[in-house]
Structure formats: C-alpha cells, structure tokens
Swiss-Prot record:
Part of the 30S ribosomal subunit. Forms a bridge to the 50S subunit in the 70S ribosome, contacting the 23S rRNA. One of its GO terms (biological process) is translation. The lineage of its organism: Bacteria, Bacillati, Bacillota, Bacilli, Lactobacillales. Keywords: Ribonucleoprotein, Ribosomal protein, RNA-binding, rRNA-binding. PROSITE patterns: RIBOSOMAL_S15. SMART domains: Ribosomal_S15. It comes from Streptococcus pyogenes serotype M5 (strain Manfredo). Belongs to the universal ribosomal protein uS15 family. This is Small ribosomal subunit protein uS15. InterPro entries: Ribosomal_uS15, Ribosomal_uS15_bac-type, uS15_NS1_RNA-bd_sf.
C-alpha cells in the first residue's frame, strides 16, 4: 500500500522548512523513512516477496544518499533530523 495523501501531508507539515516546502531534504528523508518502516513490516510478514525487498533496498539507498548530502552541507540540520526521526547514525 502506498502512503496516503493525508499521511504524506501530515509528514510534510511536520518537517517542512517553510510554507509550501515539499522538496527539502528533511521532507524527503521523513517521507522515505515512513515508507521504509511500512515496507519493513510488510517484509516481516511476507519473507518471499523479493520484489518488495528490492524496492525497500532502493529506498534505503536513496535515503542514505540524501542523508550523506545533508551531512556534507549542514551538520546541525543533519543531527536534528536524525534525532527527530530516531535513526541510528
């Protein structure tokens, strides 16, 4: 199941840097984190769903690249985001 419009808007409102912000690194990472957590729970139930597992790995790689970019450009924003999302880094 894809992320619902309401849930996505809720995440965007929480992590947006300004009004109408949908593309900042923080918003993208927050949405990806929600999707990754959702797919992770699906994989635990359906262990042989290899197509979903591949999609999960792609999303994890995308999030990793975005976090690396944020760490290079602004360490303080990176640390705040990691802490608010509860990611291990």
């Amino acid at each position: 199941m894809a992320i619902s419009k309401e849930k996505k808007n809720e995440i965007i409102a929480q992590y947006a840097r300004h009004e109408g912000d949908t593309g900042s690194v923080e918003v993208q990472v927050a949405v990806l984190t929600w999707e990754i957590n959702h797919l992770n729970s699906h994989i635990k139930e359906h262990k042989k769903d290899h197509a979903t597992y591949r999609g999960l790995m792609k999303k994890i790689g995308h999030r990793r690249n975005l976090l690396a970019y944020l760490r290079r450009t602004d360490v303080n924003r990176y640390r705040e985001l990691i802490q608010s999302l509860g990611l291990r880094r």
